[in-house]
C-alpha cells in the first residue's frame, strides 16, 4: 500500500449542465492506516467526494487515487480495495441478514467458508446474531444500518469509506460502531 491510501488533487464536480458546482478544487491526502473525516455543513459536497473516491461518480476535473489506483482509469482495482457504507442502508429486504452478507462476499469472489465465517463474526460484532436468519424487512432502521455497515466489512477492505455511519443508530449501537472502527484502525484499516 502506498504512503497515502487516498490522494485527491483539485477535484471539481459540477451538476446540472455545469451550473451547480458541488466540489470546487478539493485536494486531500490521507495517510495509510489513519482515520480521516470530511467535515462541513449539509450540501457542502462531502457525499459527492466520497462517491468520487469510491468510483460511483467521476470528477468533472482533477484527479484522485485510492490505494494507488486512479479512480477514473482503474475503478475495478479501486473497488477491490475499499468498503463503502453510504448514508442510507442498502440491504436486500427480501434476504435474511446472513444472506445479505453472504451475497456481498460471493459478489466479491471470496471463498464460501471464509464468507460464512466472516458473516457470522460480523453479525455477532454488530449485535445482529439473534436476527441473522430473519428477513431484513422485519429489521428496525438501526438494525438495517448496522447490517449495511457489516456488509462494507465482509471483504476485509484495507480502506473503508463511511458516509455518516452513525445515522439512525441508537447511543449503544453508536458506541459499539466506534469500538469496531477503533479495532479496524488498530489492524491497519484506513
Q: Which sequence ranges carry the predicted segments?
A:
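Helical segment within the ABC ATPase nucleotide-binding domain
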Residues: 175-187
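Walker A (P-loop) phosphate-binding loop of ABC-type ATPase nucleotide-binding domains
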Residues: 41-45
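Catalytic Walker B motif of ABC-type/P-loop ATPase nucleotide-binding domains
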Residues: 160-163
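Conserved catalytic motifs of ABC-family nucleotide-binding domains
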Residues: 156
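Conserved ABC ATPase "signature" region
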Residues: 102, 106, 113-131
Amino acid at each position: 500500500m502506498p504512503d497515502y491510501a487516498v490522494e485527491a488533487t483539485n477535484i471539481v464536480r459540477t451538476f446540472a449542465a455545469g451550473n451547480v458546482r458541488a466540489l470546487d478544487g478539493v485536494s486531500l491526502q490521507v495517510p495509510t492506516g489513519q482515520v480521516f473525516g470530511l467535515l462541513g455543513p449539509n450540501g457542502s459536497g462531502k457525499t459527492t467526494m466520497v462517491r468520487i473516491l469510491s468510483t460511483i461518480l467521476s470528477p468533472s476535473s482533477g484527479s484522485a487515487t485510492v490505494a494507488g489506483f486512479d479512480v477514473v482509469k482503474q475503478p475495478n482495482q479501486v473497488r477491490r480495495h475499499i468498503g463503502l457504507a453510504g448514508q442510507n442502508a442498502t440491504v436486500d429486504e427480501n434476504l435474511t441478514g446472513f444472506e445479505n452478507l453472504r451475497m456481498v462476499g460471493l459478489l466479491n469472489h471470496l471463498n464460501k467458508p471464509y464468507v460464512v465465517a466472516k458473516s457470522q463474526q460480523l453479525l455477532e460484532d454488530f449485535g445482529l446474531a439473534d436476527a441473522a436468519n430473519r428477513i431484513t424487512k422485519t429489521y428496525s432502521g438501526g438494525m438495517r444500518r448496522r447490517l449495511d455497515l457489516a456488509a462494507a466489512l465482509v471483504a476485509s477492505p484495507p480502506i473503508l469509506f463511511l458516509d455518516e455511519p452513525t445515522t439512525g443508530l441508537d447511543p449503544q449501537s453508536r458506541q459499539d460502531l466506534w469500538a469496531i472502527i477503533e479495532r479496524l484502525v488498530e489492524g491497519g484499516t484506513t
